[in-house]
Regions:
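Short, flexible loop/turn elements at secondary-structure junctions
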Residues: 41, 67-69, 79-81, 92, ...
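Conserved, mostly hydrophobic/aromatic
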Residues: 39, 88, 179, 221, ...
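Conserved alpha/beta catalytic core and glycan-binding cleft of carbohydrate-active enzymes
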Residues: 367, 373-538, 542-543, 547, ...
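A generic secondary-structure signal for well-formed alpha-helical elements
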Residues: 84, 92-94, 183-184, 188, ...
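Substrate-binding/active-site clefts of carbohydrate-active enzymes
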Residues: 145, 180-353, 360-386, 403, ...
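Beta-sheet entry/capping signal
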Residues: 36-38, 174-175, 217-220, 276-278, ...
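Carbohydrate-interacting/catalytic domains
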Residues: 1-177, 182, 199, 507, ...
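Core domains of carbohydrate- and sulfate-ester-processing enzymes
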Residues: 90-160, 231-239, 245, 275, ...
C-alpha cells in the first residue's frame, strides 16, 4: 500500500539561503565559511534540512537540499557554523510491502552526525505508522516526531592533541581490560560526583593508576556510540545500560560527556595514551535501535529502509533478524559498507582510537546466503591503510543460521574464543572428559586458529565477559539470580558452568570461601598463563560481585557498577593477579608467536611442548581418552624454535601443572636437558606469593586438589 507524504511546514522557509554544495563528504561538514550537508538515499524523492534553535526545541526553518548526485542529496549553507542544530525530513513512498517507509513527519537523525543533543523521549509520534490502527505498520502516521527525537549538532573537529600518538601494543603483549564508562567510575571514591559515569571520570588519576599498575595494556570500553533506551526498560525504571542499541555511529553518547563537548572524549583518549594504555571501542554495527517493522522511525528507516536493512526477500515488509534485536544492517550494500568503514576510520583517525571489538561480527560478513570470510567488509578492513593498523576483534557469532564462526575469520582479525571459557569453566568445576580440550585451550586452540599464518594471539581467551557471571559469582552461584531485571528470572543464560562450592551465594563457611578464592586464582592463572590474548573484566581482579545477576544489561545501578571498597580477600587476589600479569610479560614463552604443536623438531632436537602424566611420563592415548583424567603437566621447552628460522630458542623452560581432582595428586617433576632443578613460581593453593623453593628432578610435589602450579627450570650455576 502506497501512502502520500504530508507534513506541516515550519514557520519560516528560506530556500534562497541554500547553495548546491558537494556530495562528499557525507554528513555535515564545516569548512570555515559554511556547512555542507550530504545525505545518501537511493529511493527518496526529496530531502529537507531542518534547522532548530540552540536548545533543539523549536524548528526555525526547513530547507530542501537542492542537488542529487550519485544517490546523494546535498546542499551548502553559507555562514552556518559549528553548534548549528539540525535534522532531516525525507520524502518518498510509504510502501512497506516493498521495503519503503518514508514519512517526512518524522524528524531523522543524520547517520553521519558527529554529536547529538537531547535524549529520545518515547512517544507514539516516533512511529511511522499509527499504533493501534487496524492496518498496523501499513498505516501512516502524520504526527510530528521532532519534539521527541535527539537532534544533530554541527561540530568543529579541531583539537590540539599535543604529542599524543597511538600506543600500538604488540599483540603478544596485549592484555584486554573490558569495562564500562559508568560502571568503572560511578562508585570510585576519587572520582568527583559531577563527572562520575563520564569520559572525564575515566581521566581521574586514581582510576588510571589502578589500570596501569594492574599491568593490562588495552582498555576495551563497552559501547559509547549514542544509543537508545528501550521503552519497556524505562517503564520499569531501568535503562539499556550496556548500550548495545546504537542510533548514531559517529557520535558519542551525550550521557558520557560531562562537559557536553566532543573534546572530552579526545582528552580521555590522550590521558589513557599517556598512561601507555590503548583504547578499544566495543562497536555495534550489526543493527540499530529502530527495531523490527513495529519499531520507531528515527534515522535509517526513514532515510532509505530498503538500502540500509536486510529485508525478507519474499516480503520486504519484514526484517531479517540475525541480530536478535529486530533488524540487521545490510553491509552487502555499498553505501552501508561505506558508512561503517567511514565510522571506523573517523574513530581511528579523528578520535585516536586504537582498535575495535565488533559485536555479533558474523553479521558483518554475511551475504544473503550466509557468512563469507571474503565479504567486502572484511576485505576492506584488511586492505584499508588506516584500519589495517588498528586492532580488530570479532565476536564471531550471531543469532542467524550458520552464525557460529569461531576460527573462521580471515587473517588480520582476532576472535573471542568462547570454547576457552566453556572448557576452562568445565575443567575447574570437575566435569568429566575435559583434559584434552583443556590442553588445546592452553595452546591457543590451534585446531581452530593455526591456519593461514594466523598466530596464537588470534584466540582471545576469557573466562568471564560483560554478559554472564562475574568471576566471584561464577564460583559462588549454581544458578542465575536476575530477579532485579524484572523478567521473572527468565533472561540470561542458564548454561553457566558455574559451581557454588556448597552454598548458594554468600557464606561464612571458611572452607567454602577458601576454595572459592582458590578457584578464582585457578581461573586467573589459567587465563594469564595460556597461549593467546587474555581478556579480563574490570573488577574481577578483586572479586567484584553482581550478586548472582548474569545479565546486568539493564542495571545502571550498584549491581552493574564496580564496587571499589575492596575486602581483604579482594586485595589479596588483586596482588596475585598483578604478579601473574608480570610473569606473563616477563616470560615470552607464555605468549609465543608460534603455536605449540607437540612435534619433535629434528633440526634442533627439541619438542616445543610435552604433555605429562602425574608420574612424569608422557601422556598416552589411553590417558587422554580417560574421562576421569583431571591432572596434567604442560612442559614448555624454552629451546623450541621461536621464529621461522630453524634455530634453538633462548627462553626459559616452564612446567605448568593442573589438578582439578578434589584430592591431592603427587606429581613427579621431570628431568629436562640443560637444567638442574625446578623452582616453584606459582601455587594457587597459596593466596600470597611465597619465596621460590627448589625441587630436584624426579621429586614428587603434592599438588593440592583444585590447584595450579608453575615451575621454572634452573641450572645449578644460576643459584
Amino acid at each position: 500500500m502506497t501512502r502520500p507524504n504530508k507534513t506541516t511546514p515550519p514557520p519560516v522557509i528560506e530556500a534562497s539561503r541554500i547553495r548546491e554544495g558537494l556530495p562528499f563528504p557525507l554528513g555535515a561538514t564545516w569548512d570555515g565559511l559554511g556547512v555542507n550537508f550530504a545525505l545518501f538515499s537511493a529511493n527518496a524523492t526529496k530531502v529537507e534540512l531542518c534547522i532548530f534553535d540552540d536548545a533543539g526545541e523549536v524548528e526555525l526553518e526547513r530547507i530542501e537540499l537542492p542537488e542529487y548526485t550519485d544517490e546523494i542529496y546535498h546542499g551548502y549553507l553559507p555562514d552556518a557554523h559549528p553548534g548549528l542544530i539540525y535534522g532531516y525530513r525525507v520524502y518518498g513512498a510509504y510502501d512497506p510491502a516493498n521495503g519503503h517507509r518514508f514519512n517526512p513527519n518524522k524528524l531523522l537523525i543524520d547517520p553521519y552526525a558527529k554529536q547529538l543533543v537531547g535524549q529520545l523521549k518515547w512517544s507514539e509520534a516516533l512511529f511511522g505508522y499509527t499504533i493501534g490502527h487496524p492496518d498496523g505498520d501499513l498505516s501512516f502516521d502524520e504526527r510530528d516526531s521532532a519534539p521527541f527525537v535527539p537532534k544533530c549538532k554541527v561540530i568543529d573537529p579541531a583539537h590540539t592533541w599535543g604529542h599524543d600518538h597511538r600506543v600500538s601494543v604488540p599483540w603478544d603483549k596485549t592484555i584486554l581490560y573490558e569495562t564500562h564508562v559508568r560502571g568503572l567510575t560511578m562508585r570510585h571514591p576519587s572520582v568527583p560526583e559531577n563527572v562520575r559515569g563520564t569520559f572525564a571520570g575515566l581521566m581521574v588519576d586514581d582510576v588510571l593508576e589502578h589500570i596501569r599498575k594492574l599491568g593490562v595494556s588495552s582498555v576495551e570500553l563497552l559501547p559509547i556510540h549514542a544509543f537508545v533506551n528501550d521503552q519497556h526498560l524505562l517503564h520499569k525504571g531501568m535503562t539499556n545500560y550496556w548500550g548495545y542499541n546504537s542510533i548514531a555511529f559517529f557520535a558519542p553518547d551525550p550521557r558520557y560527556l560531562a562537559s557536553g563537548k566532543i573534546a572530552e572524549f579526545k582528552e580521555m583518549v590522550a590521558h589513557l595514551h599517556e598512561a601507555n594504555l590503548e583504547v578499544i571501542l566495543d562497536v555495534v554495527y550489526n543493527h540499530t535501535a529502530e527495531g523490527n517493522e513495529q519499531g520507531p522511525t528515527l534515522s535509517m528507516r526513514g532515510i532509505d529502509n530498503a538500502s540500509y536493512y536486510r529485508l525478507m526477500p519474499d516480503d520486504k515488509r519484514y526484517y531479517i533478524n540475525d541480530s536478535g534485536t529486530g533488524n540487521t544492517l545490510d553491509l552487502s550494500h555499498p553505501c552501508v559498507l561505506q558508512m561503517v568503514t567511514d565510522s571506523l576510520r573517523y574513530w581511528a583517525t579523528e578520535m585516536h582510537v586504537d582498535g575495535f571489538r565488533f559485536d555479533l561480527a558474523t553479521i558483518l560478513g554475511r551475504y544473503h546466503d550466509g557468512f563469507d570470510e571474503r565479504h567486502s567488509f572484511l576485505v576492506a578492513c584488511r586492505q584499508d591503510p588506516v584500519l589495517r593498523q588498528v586492532k580488530m576483534i570479532a565476536e564471531p557469532w550471531d543469532c542467524g543460521p550458520g552464525g557460529y564462526q569461531v576460527g573462521r575469520f580471515p587473517p588480520g582479525w582476532v576472535e573471542w574464543n568462547d570454547k576457552f571459557r566453556d572448557t576452562v569453566r568445565a575443567f575447574w568445576k570437575g566435569d568429566d572428559g575435559q583434559l584434552a580440550d583443556f590442553a588445546s585451550r592452553m595452546t591457543a586452540s590451534g585446531e581452530m586458529f593455526n591456519q593461514r599464518g594466523r598466530r596464537p594471539y588470534a584466540s582471545v581467551n576469557f573466562v568471564t565477559a560483560h554478559d554472564g557471571f562475574t568471576l566471584h559469582d561464577l564460583v559462588s552461584y549454581n544458578d542465575k539470580h536476575n530477579e532485579a531485571n524484572d523478567e521473572n528470572n527468565q533472561d540470561g543464560s542458564n548454561n553457566n558452568l558455574s559451581w557454588n562450592h556448597g552454598v548458594e551465594g554468600p557464606t561464612d563457611d571458611p572452607e567454602i570461601n577458601a576454595l572459592r578464592h582458590r578457584q578464582m586464582r585457578n581461573f586467573f592463572a589459567t587465563l594469564l598463563l595460556a597461549q593467546g590474548t587474555p581478556m579480563i573484566v574490570a573488577g574481577d581482579e578483586f572479586a567484584r560481585t553482581q550478586h548472582g545477576n548474569n545479565n546486568a544489561y539493564c542495571q545502571d545501578s550498584e549491581i552493574g557498577w564496580v564496587n571499589w571498597d575492596l575486602s581483604e580477600d579482594g586485595a589479596t587476589l588483586l596482588k596475585f593477579v598483578k604478579r601473574l600479569i608480570k610473569l606473563r610479560l616477563t616470560y615470552p614463552i607464555l605468549r609465543r608467536g608460534r603455536f605449540l604443536v607437540g612435534n619433535y623438531n629434528e633440526d634442533i632436537g627439541v619438542k616445543d611442548v610435552t604433555w605429562l602424566a602425574p608420574d612424569g611420563s608422557e601422556m598416552t592415548i589411553e590417558q587422554w581418552q580417560d574421562s576421569h583424567g583431571r591432572c596434567l603437566g604442560m612442559l614448555m621447552d624454552g629451546r623450541a624454535q621461536e621464529t621461522g628460522i630453524r634455530r634453538k630458542g633462548g627462553d626459559a623452560t616452564l612446567l605448568l601443572v593442573v589438578n582439578a581432582h578434589h584430592d591431592i595428586v603427587n606429581f613427579s617433576l621431570p628431568e629436562v636437558p640443560e637444567g638442574s632443578f625446578w623452582t616453584c613460581m606459582v601455587d594457587t593453593n597459596q593466596p600470597t606469593v611465597r619465596g621460590q623453593e627448589r625441587f630436584d628432578f624426579d621429586s614428587e610435589y603434592s599438588v593440592t586438589g583444585r590447584s595450579l602450579l608453575l615451575f621454572e627450570l634452573q641450572r645449578e650455576e644460576e643459584e
